[in-house]
A protein has these predicted regions:
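Glycine/proline-rich, flexible active-site/cofactor-binding loop segments
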Residues: 78
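Compositionally biased, proline/threonine/alanine/serine-rich low-complexity intrinsically disordered stretches
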Residues: 219-244
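An alpha-helical repeat/solenoid feature that recognizes helix-turn-helix modules
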Residues: 1-21, 29-75, 84-120, 128-169, ...
Length: 244
């Protein structure tokens, strides 16, 4: 999803093709990708985690400029599985990551009614401080807020929307002096304590959300004092520039 599309060197093309084939090779015959690594241990149902993994793989494959027959078949199977499979049986999804990725998928693959409904759900879940939690039941954090900003902007919500401006304010006020964002763990015994991996992901998505939602004119006129540049998504224990 983040590859440099201007790089058409033969070596790069071969690497992208190899990665494409690797991802397709991991797809289940039913159309989904099973979550791996640390993802199955996250504080949400594994069915929801599998859906998020599937949506991210699908969106990554969808960026390829010249999809081949094998990729098209993989894509269509994934879309069909996502549409026909609820995240948690009869229960709604619990993570903002599911709602945001589902919105991006709906926008990408032409589901106007779903786009509107998902966008409304995300906007309604915004907390009073302007942010979203990675888990919607938890406090706001950079991870959930960056995801929401990215998805809302991708779905067509303008940067002038009050919800976007409030989210910017939340991220500006919670960024550390080092340029990163602190995201706490969600499970005992790490709950309410800095979690290194979550902070890495949170800082990355905060940067992606800001980049996606900010207009070029705003980016050019923003000063370091009003919109501190993210120096690195590497976790820092620095203090926030201001309290929300």
């Amino acid at each position: 999803m983040a590859r440099d599309r201007s790089d058409a060197k033969e070596e790069t093309v071969k690497s992208v093709d190899a990665l494409r084939d690797f991802i397709i090779g991991l797809q289940d015959k039913d159309g989904f990708w099973k979550a791996g690594g640390q993802l199955p241990s996250q504080k949400r149902p594994i069915s929801e985690t599998n859906q998020v993994s599937t949506m991210i793989c699908l969106l990554g494959l969808a960026t390829l400029d010249q999809p081949n027959e094998k990729m098209i078949e993989s894509r269509d199977k994934a879309v069909a599985w996502i549409k026909s499979t609820p995240p948690n049986g009869k229960d709604p999804a619990v993570s903002g990551e599911w709602y945001t990725m589902r919105l991006v998928v709906a926008k990408k693959f032409g589901e106007p009614k779903d786009v509107e409904a998902l966008r409304d759900q995300i906007l309604a879940a915004q907390q009073s401080d302007g942010g979203w939690g990675w888990l919607w039941a938890d406090k706001s954090d950079a991870f959930g807020t960056g995801l929401a900003l990215y998805a809302l902007a991708e779905s067509g919500v303008p940067s002038s929307h009050p919800a976007i401006e409030r989210a910017w304010k939340f991220l500006i006020e919670t960024q550390t002096d080092a340029g990163s964002w602190i995201v706490n763990g969600t499970k005992t015994p790490n709950k309410d304590k800095l979690h290194a991996m979550s902070s890495f992901w949170g800082s990355t998505w905060a940067l992606l959300g800001l980049s996606k939602s900010l207009l070029d004119s705003v980016m050019k006129t923003a000063t370091a004092s009003t919109l501190p540049a993210v120096q690195s998504p590497i976790v820092s224990t620095g203090t926030p520039t201001a309290k929300p």
